[in-house]
UniProtKB/Swiss-Prot annotation:
It comes from Streptomyces coelicolor (strain ATCC BAA-471 / A3(2) / M145). The active site is at C408. Keywords: Arginine metabolism, Cytoplasm, Hydrolase. The keyword Cytoplasm applies. Pathway: Amino-acid degradation; L-arginine degradation via ADI pathway; carbamoyl phosphate from L-arginine: step 1/2. This is Arginine deiminase. Its EC number is 3.5.3.6. Pfam families: ADI (PF02274). One of its GO terms (biological process) is arginine catabolic process to ornithine. Gene3D superfamilies: Arginine deiminase (1.10.3930.10), L-arginine/glycine Amidinotransferase, Chain A (3.75.10.10). It comes from the Bacteria.
Amino acid sequence: MTSNESAVSQALGVHSEVGRLRKVLVCSPGLAHRRLTPTNSDELLFDDVMWVENAQRDHAAFVGELRRRGVEVVELHDLLAQIMALPEARAWLLDRKITANQVGIGLIDAARAYLETLSPRELAEYLVGGLATSDLPEDFRSPHLALARESTGAREYLMPPLPNTLYTRDTTCWLYGGLTLNPLYWSARHDETLLMKAIYTFHPDFKGSKVWWGDPERDWGQATFEGGDIMPVGNGVVLMGMSERTSRQAITQVAAALFRSGAAEHVVVAGMPKLRSAMHLDTVFTFADRDVVTLYPRIMDAVHTFSLRPGDRAPGFDVVDEGSTPFVDVVAKALGLPKLRVVETGGDAYASERQQWDSGNNAVAVEPGVVFTYDRNTLTNALLREARVEVVTIVGAELGRGRGGGHCMTCPLVREPVDF
């Protein structure tokens, strides 16, 4: 690696969807997924329980292949353990996690005292994996614990597990030279962004990062924003899905913040149906090369597209209704391309619906024309290869049980721009 390449790799920022991926955040399956049961999986947003050992094996293979492709991979548990070795970071996070509203007024002292005895690595495991009422040793138990144990579902935890941390894409978005700290749609995921704020506040590799918008310590009301809906594609353009999880209220605030800072010049909004199967834009649309996208036409053909651009009048941007112009055509024009080559979900009506459900269009690129996808989506993968895209497969039988693929499982931290 040249000195110039080294400098690029260390400058946090994401400048495209397919430029060379230099650094990425992932979260390995672990304790949080061992906490999933048939009783609580719906509440924790998983369709089924995981075979955790196989999920760990498959995730490790995914990470290993990313590294072989030259990507620096950092892992959420590791980053948390590193900052939990810092007394000020530990105090900051436990002050916000161990509260009357979280653990109950009668268990604050006992839960805090127990967590303070743990090593940084053990504490990181509990912060992601959850603290069950049964985890407190006898020395830290009180009469209040019996009351807590009568609770059901995820509420039997003093700190609920966060299994959706597997999908690191959603909690933060690097948009060119800064990031957003996202208020997530479901309450089961809210504390994920708090963990990320701790990392960005205290970890030496991330301190000083520019935050465009968002703060998990605020109530954002109807303004919800998730990274699976957000794509900084280059040329100052950001794609945003207005979906089940990402609201108009958040999109307009983020767009205004990006325009004020000069970070972006055009936000293309995809108005989507509110469906779990298409919860985010990246479940039905991703880039595979500079001019190649893979998409699920049954959803994308019905998308209503809007363009937001900086404006002189309040609230600081203008809205253009793109009418009947297809989303892909609006995106192509924004990037200065005559058109985008489209790879649709493979198979007949039945097969394509199954493949989309199994994240067939949820590709993540490591460089132009090289993507990772789940192995089970054989028909879509074959079509990508016909379009001269190199497809590296991930075993997806277990990792996809929360409805996410390679794009969902990666939060790019450093990605190079591309020329259009």
